[in-house]
Amino acid sequence: MCLARAMQCKKTAEVLSRVQPVLENWRPLVALPEGSRARQRGSGLATPRVTELTHWASTARRFRTLGKLPWAMWLDSAAADAAERFDILVADPYLTLRTRGAVTEIAARGDAARESRRPPFELVREQLGDVAEGAPGLPFSGGAVGYFGYDLGRRLERIPSIAAADIAMPDLAIGLYDWAVVIDHAARRTWLVGNGLDERTFADWPALVARLSAEPPPEPPAFRVRARPVSNLGRDAYAAAFRAVQDHIRRGDCYQVNLTQRFEAEAEGDAWHAYVRLREINPAPFAAYLDLPDGKVVCSSPERFLSLRDGRVETKPIKGTRPRSQDPERDRALAEELRASAKDRAENVMIVDLLRNDLGKCCVPGSVRASKLFDIESFASVHQLVSTVEGRLAPGKHALDLVAACFPGGSITGAPKVAAMKIIEELEPHRRSVYCGSIGYMGFDGNMDTNIAIRTLVQQGGRVYTWAGGGVIADSNVDAEYQESLDKAAAMLAVMAGQ
């Protein structure tokens, strides 16, 4: 054995000696009843195993213990309110799926990759298998984690190919994870949960606990943008695209179109630092950091796309934005101005109606309803107008059926959805890539939570990209809409500028 290997073994043994009492006393949060429907090891279905880890105040520090493990992802409830209190960390999936155009590459650990032209949503559902019990009390016990890029919508609808596809990220990047770290900010507790679908998981359990309990490796290289970000729709080009949208509306082609501009710059270092900074200045309940072979994804989304828990479906579209003010009185006035805005309420209700129709494709008839309309939710940089639509998943339907029925989210397309997507393709110079897609998880237990991938930054191929946009309707004002897009981009651009 070489000296370096011997030293590593000694270090692992030292860490194990500190965490062995935890290993010997692991227990489920709640005991599963005798004979309950649970995953059986050996048949591909196993009762989840749960070990409580020492809780660390810094989830970023815990994530860094994953080091160079492939496909590391952090689903981050950075706002840490009572409703969104859990963080989920995963890495080293036993299988990955990456879709580019009509082809999905499926790569299982240790096997040669294969390709399929079947619908990607079907492929992910197939890998998840039959619904089984999760770990009681935890939102996620293993399953699929990753993103569906906006352009995956081309597999669902006939959209022309006009915009340039210049970011070499997959349309879909999903990992199947046998284990996960789940952090409850409210209870200040942390667990490692695993299923044993991958035979290495339980064999490597002590080493995994040791890794997650050890000091993290050194920080990666600092992130730096080398030049000022450039928009693909400058002020004049944005105005021309805005006028084209309103021409479509006057002709009756659509009611609303989400028009977006993209900012791009050369960058060096690691976008991890951009994410850490972003969650400091703009914490959001549906944030995420994805460290993928193709690039890194940084997301600070305030918007839920689809949640499914115990058959209850929820979506929370955002339409309507005002900037925050440091002056408390002015800040309250901006929030009330948004609440009272007829234009923003009209935008919002258009998307509520669209999503009610989308949910109706997979929900029990009569169960879909708008439970809340025009709530104000305030974040670090903006106030948002948010509504909530709920339903009950129909028998025989799966989380992936729901995603396919609703994708991409109506709040980032417009209405009618397909017409709006065609207009977006006509007017936006570049494809959206990860932006305006969805990031989240789909568990072996049938539950799901996903975001709308807005307030998103992608680092790929020596460059960094971010986007911002908003809904254009008949009585929109070009100056107001352009400014709204800049307000939404403010936090991302500040991070890109190193502020």
Task: Go through the PLM ranges and name each one.
Residues 15-499:
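Extended alpha-helical targeting/anchoring segments
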